[in-house]
């Protein structure tokens, strides 16, 4: 599909707490490196190109950027790139960060943060982004976290102190979402989701919508590629629908995701200006009920 003149507004809007965002956003995980993300020996990406992509994203109407302090490669940090590219920040730009996981300066993974260590992670994001508060902070649940409530409570205290505006969770089950909601309001859930998801995952997306909680899928384009990006193999039905619309498989995957409900937000990431324009344009692609069913909508 043609991407000229299509902006992120084509996907519609959603409100995270009191912050209105276009449903087509941008994920910064892929900016610091070329190839697989979140590994110690990643190849640093081109800094000027990454900065240009971020600025172009905002020009195209993207006002929801997802990042984390642990998104970095040797020489490159997603937060630093965002700060350099976009500060002073537009008034409508919402930056969403994640805490819980951590990496040492060499890129190796550290044990999950304890509740008393979360303030340090929040302050690291504040420093790198050049902000005095964070718009939304997601607690990424890690297997070693015995109590989600204890960690979420620590973030709620930072929200009450004015360092955080709104809270979300990532990598959680419906039961864990309820556990967090018993502590403080949750504005978004960020989980892995896309074409081919399980019936349980579909049900969780629907449940979030009924509660007015945004659902923000990660790896919606990559499928089984995960952190390595999209793989060469593609779902046959995705390819068929893409051909029918003159679109790419990635655009079909994004459109399918967005049509799962008005509360679903997309955060595709890329370091390529052409792919950025294609991703944003996917917000204008409308699939028929038959096409949605063929791709797996229950």
Where would I find each of the regions flagged by the language model?
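Active-site groove signature of glycoside hydrolases
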Residues: 126-144
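Acidic (Asp/Glu)-rich catalytic clusters
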Residues: 18-20, 59, 83-94, 126-130, ...
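Residues at the N-termini of beta-strands
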Residues: 23, 64, 133-136, 166, ...
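Short, acidic/polar
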Residues: 43-57, 112-130, 173-178
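Beta/alpha (TIM)-barrel catalytic core signal, keyed to glycine-rich beta->alpha loops juxtaposed to Asp/Glu
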Residues: 3-8, 142-298
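N-terminal binding-site loop/beta-alpha segment at the start of enzyme catalytic domains
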Residues: 1-93
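Active-site mouth loops of central-metabolism enzymes
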Residues: 32-48, 104-116, 140
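A short, structured active-site edge motif that brings together acidic residues
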Residues: 92-105
